Amino acid sequence: FFNYGVGTNEDSNISSTVLIDLKGNELSLYKYKGTQFIDNIEEVATTFTELKEVMYNRYKEMQINGDKLYKGKPIYVVIDEVGTIGTYHDKKIRDAIFNDMIELFQKGRACKIIFLIFAQKCDSTNIPSNVLTNIQSRILMKTDSEFNTNSMIGTKEQIQNITHIDVANFNKGRAITKDGITSETSLIQVPYVSENEHRNIVRHLGHSLKN
């Protein structure tokens, strides 16, 4: 809400937001100005193609101005349960999306196309390994999966250098972050908001951002 200001393009700190939820039940709450909600995979493929074109245009602008980092507003792409893409039956569409994701991950950050992806399990079962390796910064929340812990942050011994609390016993809002550039890890505590309170915030503050 803060980044969107009062809902006008001039007041917002964000160019636009793309919310992808192929299960279609959670991110559909946020149908605001400058926000595109997607719940079908064909539209995901189309949107990623369009985002690549935006990325190329931003790079051209950066080259003309001699900038290493795009000076305009960022575009955020939020994908809930990214592994759902890997279960889609059409291999051609599925592979095209993952290939576009790799290119956008590799090149998009400098021109402020930022991806935030969420998954219950981070392995190559539903997400190709070459996609996973191009995810730079990572966040590990409460989990009893040793595989998730290893793939996101590191071994149990490495975790113990960060915190003495077992990841499986983390409080709500507790997480370990890993910086994609420096590989530095940090233990953080995010304020926890209950589902009911969250829905109240969406209802009371979201009216000024509605389309």
Task: Describe each PLM feature range.
Residues 163-167:
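C-terminal boundary and immediately downstream tail of ABC-type ATPase nucleotide-binding domains
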Residues 168-211:
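C-terminal alpha-helical "lid" subdomain
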